[in-house]
Amino acid sequence: MDREETLLKLKNNPEYIKELTETDEELEIFIVKNSGNNIKYIENPSKEVQKKAIKNTPLSAKYIKNIDKEIGIICVKSLWNSLEVINNPNEEIIEEAIKTKGWAIQFVKEPSEELQMLAVSKDYDSIKYIENPSENVQLAAIENYYVAIRFIKNPSLKAKVKAVISNGEAINYISNYDLDDIKVFIHQNINVVKYIYESIDVEIVIDILKEKVKEENIEKKYIEDFLELEVLEMDKINFVREYGSKNAKKILVDYKLSM
């Protein structure tokens, strides 16, 4: 059988390559260019054959027993979830997959904290694929976007507070908190009150505010947010004048002058 006849037969039936007593890289490339999945008919494909197959069909990686590192990286960069089908990927392939999409962490058995950090820094919600994330990982995810708290089953207090500081609305995404937690949240971000006003005793809020406004290092934003908090009906200006530190009163004056 001449070359042309062989190519024609391979085109119609790529599995025919297994019947050839002698094959070469050109023939192997020919069948994987038609469909990357045809690499399953090739024993020990060369790096170039792997490359052609992967570029054609990234998920054909599942048919490669010993994928070349460079090819594995090309594969996961092209399609992040192809990591799931790669046999025994090395650390570099895993890392590149996670750099492409944090969700790739779900295909890594017992990922290191370093890989977890990489994942949540890339995509905050990839933390939902991490079982019992450490506090550092929780904080990194929340640093990326506060809504990450929504996907953490048992967030640490520090993680909860970080989310709430970022946005008071974060309290809507925290499933487990108690009164002591709420006091800390309000102390850090008065805007939390917007989302829990109907379920909290106003006197508790007032007590927290008395402690907060007397702090000399109180932030300008906290005072401004307090003054603009419509849901809390009270004489806020006189409250700051009566209970506020020197700095709080200065912020109040500056705020009134800017109106």
Can you name each region flagged by the protein language model?
Residues 1-259:
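Alpha-helical scaffold segments
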